[in-house]
Regions:
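Membrane-proximal helix-loop-helix interfaces that form the catalytic/acceptor-binding platform
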Residues: 1-392, 398-413
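Short, solvent-exposed mixed-charge patches
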Residues: 416-417
């Protein structure tokens, strides 16, 4: 798309917008199937859509949001297969799951257990080899294609030192704490130990509810098609176990919050299915459970509402304002050479992308310093973009603040003349 239409901000976000529509489409279908009760359906939908951290990724030009949408679409197609036993739905489920991995390779942790469980379900529906092969052949051939396509990228990834060294998260609980911290934006709802308390509550709920689902699965003849909700519940613990095995076997660290993003939809499905089973067993008493979670979700999303920046890419908030300011400076001063700009190292990638790719031609007005890691602010460029005044204090004798970015601590400095 970028090759045809250029690297316009809307164009580079089209895949993730598709992911957002897929996510919403699949979420609506899955929640309608979970329960006959309207309020339970609405509750389940809010659990899938009410995480502000997850929602951010449907506006960022990254693969995480697209992967989440494809994953939920795969789960919806697997539900359809469990209900109808049609080979087309099984093949579609594997296609969506395979594409989810291509959007974000972390979803291999979803893909592997999903394929295993959906093929077990296919065998349960078609317990003779001839019937199983007839129903599963298109899906299995599709699976082989994806395995072949994924082999070389995975081989290359194994050579990347970041796979071994990035984040250094040494425990699964630590990984979950990072995810919870990202989801609540460090709001101390329960005091200083909010993150730890909420993480324990989430872990205990998921473990306990998985045990309940396992009991129900056993009572219903160990068949997923007896209640497709069992399949939805099983995916989260299966993915977590896969993650633990991967860490143990490969020595890689546990997942940082954005890499673990795909856990949130799976957790949301567990919360929704729990409400459906609770209502089924106890009727309106389920409102106690739903009211608490709905209240917290509404409170959290209202506290974390975010229309101006990304919590993951917080340093990108003022990029366009700085570029527009420098463009205006170039034009009003009648310059013929691009303006020299240096910046804190975390901001460099965003500027370099816009200068190299943005079709609006900012490279005519601005020349960026070569990429560098963390280093003290230098005096080599006419303009310096700092994260805060504290960072720039050692060069303030030679620079003036010409643009404080509203709503942030970022400042653009210019050499005194």
């Amino acid at each position: 798309l970028a090759g045809i239409f250029g690297w316009h901000p809307v164009v580079v976000r089209l895949p993730v917008l598709v992911g957002g529509f897929l996510y919403l489409w699949a979420a609506i279908h899955l929640t309608r199937k979970m329960s006959e009760q309207t309020w339970v359906r609405l509750f389940a939908l809010v659990m899938l859509l009410g995480n502000p951290y997850l929602l951010e990724f449907f506006s960022l030009a990254r693969g995480y949001g697209l992967a989440a949408g494809l994953m939920l679409a795969a789960l919806w197609q697997s539900w359809c297969f469990l209900e109808k036993n049609q080979s087309g739905h099984l093949r579609s489920a594997i296609i969506f799951a395979g594409l989810a991995v291509y959007a974000n390779f972390t979803l291999l942790l979803f893909f592997a257990p999903f394929i295993l469980l959906v093929l077990i379900a296919a065998w349960q529906l078609n317990p003779s080899f001839s019937n199983f092969w007839k129903k599963s052949r298109p899906a299995l051939l599709t699976l082989l294609v994806f395995v072949a396509l994924l082999f070389e990228p995975l081989r290359q990834l194994r050579k990347d030192p970041e796979i071994q060294g990035w984040n250094k998260l040494g425990s699964f609980f630590g990984s979950m704490e990072q995810s919870v911290k990202a989801a609540i934006q460090i709001n101390a709802y329960l005091g200083d130990n909010t993150v730890e308390i909420l993480t324990w509550l989430a872990v205990l709920f998921s473990v306990g509810f998985t045990a309940v689902a396992l009991w129900r699965w056993w009572q219903q003849g160990r068949r997923f098609d007896a209640d497709p909700r069992l399949f939805l519940v099983a995916i989260l613990p299966a993915a977590m176990i896969t993650n633990m095995l991967q860490v143990h076997l490969t020595g890689t660290p546990y997942l940082q919050s954005r890499l673990a993003l795909f856990y949130w939809p799976l957790f949301g499905l567990q919360l929704g299915v729990a409400a459906a089973w609770f209502w089924q067993a106890k009727g309106k008493l389920a409102w106690v459970y739903m009211a608490v979670l709905l209240s917290f979700t509404v409170l959290n999303i209202s506290r974390c509402v975010n229309l101006t920046k990304s919590s993951e890419w917080w340093f990108d908030q003022g990029t366009y304002q700085v570029l527009d300011f420098l463009k205006k400076t170039y034009e009003t001063e009648g310059r013929s050479e691009p303006i020299g700009l240096d910046a804190h190292h975390v901001m460099l990638n965003s500027f370099m992308f816009h200068l190299e790719r943005d079709p609006r031609g900012f490279d005519k007005y601005v020349k960026m310093a070569p990429w560098h890691g963390f280093q003290p602010p230098g005096r080599d460029y006419e303009f310096f973009y700092a994260i805060n005044p504290e960072e720039a204090k050692d060069i303030m004798d030679a620079y003036d603040v010409v643009l404080p970015v509203p709503g942030t601590s970022f400042i653009l400095l210019r050499k005194k003349r």
